[in-house]
């Protein structure tokens, strides 16, 4: 929590509490909109003081907003005011907690005054390369530009380096030294194979030049990381069952640790990062070249940065409801959005003539919105049991669960949610400790798979604790994400479909399982495991998980942003999730593409922008672009 002690002292000095003291402890609750949905804060007031505070927001990103909520509540109690400092990297969640806490306390008759913000002086700064957004791609862009001789300024709206990259696990690359060490000359695939795979997945609609550049340069990004003391290692096997027969291309790293090393190198190379500073408008000269940006600082003062090249690395638009509705349609109201930015970086580029690229979402798994579950959904939502839509009808080959992107997209096509149904016999089998495992693979094998005799994780889940499973269904029932139905009629009522349709689906599916042959969607015989026959029936509702959003502007292979005629906009570059063309229609299901492209595009854009800045010849007059 940034400057917590100092900032809180200032707040307390100016905060005044009004209202009569309470004679006994009372609880009050209020809600406010956070990052992914509503955040509810419950406060306990005793003798006119804040005795306790709790916050809950099931749609907040666990690693960011989820982690911030208890910190904020602790600060509210410790400092006896809702107006505490926000937590770095979780501004929207922080503001929601503060707003909801203030509203809850107002119910108790307690009101507070915010500390007056003293506006600082406006500033003008000059540099060769300006990087807007210091997430994963912005970090490598800034460092690469500096290492290529540019004077670099980075502006970041939070105080956290790396953004959502802090939650990333690994990246795609082919032809690395790490693969050479493992495979020697028998790698099994090459750049040609992976380029064709990317293009085939996009039905040849992808940006071929950009994809080719990425496939060829990703290995150099891995080496770049290694050269900067970042621990990168080749995964022992593919992350999901669907990719077990492919060359291992997933290169893991240590989550937040890489950005500790990145910060050291940014400091060594003189990169000037302006924290809590948000770019609001790009500047152009009379010829249309982008020559800087106007930014707003936390205290309301203005920072104007004059630059010879600008790289926009502001991340996805998942926090922008209008853009997300454009990408998802009516499914927006059903999906679980895990994280993302507000799309302001894209809007700034559109304002200077950037062509609008395809807007996509990163569909990555399906699960309930309920939290604090122990074991149930590891199986009900992660194995190839029976899945149905809101009409009670089967809609996919459940083998798609071997890849989170594929089955998540299938569920999105059903409106963003779907249901699984298993019977008591299946649960009994899953909980039978006389067996070594549950008998069915789970696609998150590397998280939940049991340890085999060789000490490695397997694709199978260990038998579950039935009591824990039942406790989970109590939670699911309470939150509306599940039910234990004694009859098919009850199951149909929960789903909202006709009993006849659901019963026909179940009867047909049971026939496929018993025959060992799926005549509808051709699920493999070895995965036709669980009939649905005798109640009680365990029904789980799962929502499409959206990790973020992809795209917004088109670029060439140099990461130069282009206009509607595919002509580069002078001195403007974009990286990472701002860029369209790597995925088309749906997030590409090649492991590590997101982080791999973020880091690689940043590294390349930084080098290209630095080179361009050396030949930059500014026009005498600098003006703001007017649409």
Q: Language model features by range: what are they?
A:
Residues 298-301, 305-370, 374, 595-598, ...:
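Glycine-rich loop(s) and the adjacent beta-strand/alpha-helix scaffold that form part
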Residues 147-167:
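Glycine-rich FAD pyrophosphate-binding loop
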Residues 160-272, 387, 394, 432, ...:
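Conserved N-terminal/central alpha/beta ligand/cofactor-binding core
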Residues 251-308, 346, 352:
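Helical element adjacent to the flavin cofactor pocket in flavoenzyme catalytic cores
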Residues 126-154:
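N-terminal Rossmann-like FAD-binding beta1-loop-alpha1 element of flavoenzymes
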Residues 346-348, 355-494:
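An anion/pyrophosphate-binding glycine-rich loop and adjacent beta-alpha core
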Residues 281, 289, 487-490, 501-586:
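A glycine-rich dinucleotide-binding beta-alpha-beta segment and adjacent secondary-structure elements
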Residues 26-117:
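Active-site- and interface-proximal helix/loop "cap" or "latch" segments in soluble metabolic
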């Amino acid at each position: 929590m940034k400057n917590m002690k100092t900032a809180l002292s200032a707040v307390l000095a100016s905060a005044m509490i009004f209202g009569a003291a309470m004679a006994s402890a009372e609880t009050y609750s209020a809600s406010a909109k956070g990052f992914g949905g509503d955040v509810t804060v419950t406060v306990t007031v005793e003798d006119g003081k804040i005795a306790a505070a709790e916050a809950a927001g099931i749609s907040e990103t666990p690693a960011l907003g989820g982690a911030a909520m208890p910190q904020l509540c602790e600060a509210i109690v410790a400092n006896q005011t809702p107006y505490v400092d926000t937590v770095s990297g979780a501004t929207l969640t922080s503001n929601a907690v503060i707003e909801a806490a203030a509203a809850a306390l107002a119910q108790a008759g307690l009101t507070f005054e915010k500390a007056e913000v003293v506006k600082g002086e406006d500033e003008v700064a000059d540099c060769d390369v300006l990087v807007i957004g210091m997430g994963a791609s912005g970090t490598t862009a800034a460092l690469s530009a500096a290492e290529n001789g540019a004077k670099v300024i980075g502006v970041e709206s939070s105080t956290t380096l790396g953004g959502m990259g802090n939650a990333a696990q690994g990246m795609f690359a082919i032809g690395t030294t790490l693969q050479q060490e493992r495979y020697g000359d028998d790698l099994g695939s090459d750049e040609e194979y992976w380029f064709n795979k990317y293009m085939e997945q996009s039905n040849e609609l992808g940006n071929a030049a950009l994809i080719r550049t990425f496939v060829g340069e990703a290995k150099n990004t891995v080496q770049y990381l290694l050269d900067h003391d970042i621990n990168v290692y080749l995964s022992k096997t593919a992350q999901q069952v669907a990719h077990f027969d492919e060359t291992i291309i997933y290169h893991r790293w240590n989550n937040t640790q890489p950005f500790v090393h990145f910060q050291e190198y940014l400091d060594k190379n003189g990169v000037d990062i302006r924290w809590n500073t948000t770019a609001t408008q790009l500047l152009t000269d009379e010829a249309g070249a982008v020559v800087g940006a106007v930014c707003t600082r936390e205290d309301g003062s203005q920072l104007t940065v004059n630059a010879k090249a600008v790289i926009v690395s502001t991340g996805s638009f998942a926090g922008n409801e209008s853009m997300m509705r454009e990408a998802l349609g009516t499914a927006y109201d059903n999906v679980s959005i895990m994280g993302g930015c507000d799309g302001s970086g894209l809007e700034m580029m559109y304002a200077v003539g950037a062509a609008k690229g395809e807007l996509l979402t990163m569909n990555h798994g399906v699960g309930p919105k309920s939290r604090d579950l122990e074991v149930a959904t590891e199986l009900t939502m992660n194995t190839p049991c029976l899945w149905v839509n809101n009409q009670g009808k089967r809609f996919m080959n459940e083998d798609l669960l071997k890849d989170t992107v594929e089955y998540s997209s299938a569920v999105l096509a059903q409106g963003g949610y779907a249901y699984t149904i298993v019977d008591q016999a299946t649960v009994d089998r899953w909980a039978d400790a006389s067996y070594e495992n549950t008998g069915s693979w789970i696609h998150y094998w590397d998280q939940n798979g049991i340890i085999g005799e060789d000490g490695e994780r397997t694709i199978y889940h260990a038998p579950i604790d039935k009591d824990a499973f039942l406790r989970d269904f109590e939670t699911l029932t309470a939150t509306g994400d599940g039910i234990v139905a004694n009859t098919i009629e009850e199951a149909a009522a929960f789903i909202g479909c006709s009993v006849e349709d659901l019963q026909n689906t179940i009867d047909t599916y049971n026939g496929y399982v018993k025959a060992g042959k799926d005549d509808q969607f051709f699920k493999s015989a070895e995965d036709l495991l669980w009939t649905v026959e005798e109640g009680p029936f365990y029904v789980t509702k799962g929502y499409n998980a959206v990790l973020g959003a992809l795209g917004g502007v088109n670029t060439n292979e140099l990461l130069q942003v282009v206009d509607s005629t595919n002509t580069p906009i002078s001195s403007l570059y974009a990286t990472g999730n701002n860029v369209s063309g790597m995925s088309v229609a749906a997030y590409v299901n090649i492991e590590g593409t997101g982080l791999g492209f973020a880091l690689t595009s940043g590294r390349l854009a930084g080098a290209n922008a630095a080179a361009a800045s050396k030949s930059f010849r500014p026009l005498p007059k600098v003006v703001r672009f007017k649409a």
